[in-house]
Amino acid sequence: NTATGADHGDLTVQLRQDASNSSYATTDVDACCTGATVAGASSAANAYGSSSTTSTVDAQYEQNSTGAESRATTDVYQYRAYDVTAASTAAANSATINNEWGYTAIRGRQTSSTDVAADARLTVGTWSGVAVVSAYGVGTTTLAPNIGSDMVVDIAQMNTGGVDANAQLNGSSSDGGQVLVSSTAVGNGFT
């Protein structure tokens, strides 16, 4: 995994990432009565992140993922919860190129045959406040926010692996609490 950045300068990136391994992240929480619980797991076979300000960015990257699986699992078991979050994010290939007030040129190639799974489970006896369960799985993704200047984008994505997202809440009662349960599965994504 790679991270770069620039402040009032030029950033030129030529990056290749190849992963033939599986990637796993697991978070397991067993608690009684806490004020707030936030639990999360994140897994990525290949990840590239860049953040720049008032810079010229030329980012060229290639990401190839051929491993069997990228899996993130979050399990929270809690007797009494006041505000509780269980979240999982899993990806085969992920790239984020953020630039503010500077020209950005992006050329990305992302391929994956890796199966991706994001599982988030919350089991709670009773809760108040907010109970949030979120699972997000994506094969290949590029996020490219660019504020205040021009951007040129050339992205090609190919995902042949399966993508699964599962968010689950099991609870017996709420003391006026709110619930948000969300799952998202995406093969290829560009934002």
Can you say where each PLM-predicted feature lies in the sequence?
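Low-complexity repeat regions of mature extracellularly deployed or surface/particle-associated proteins
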Residues: 1-191
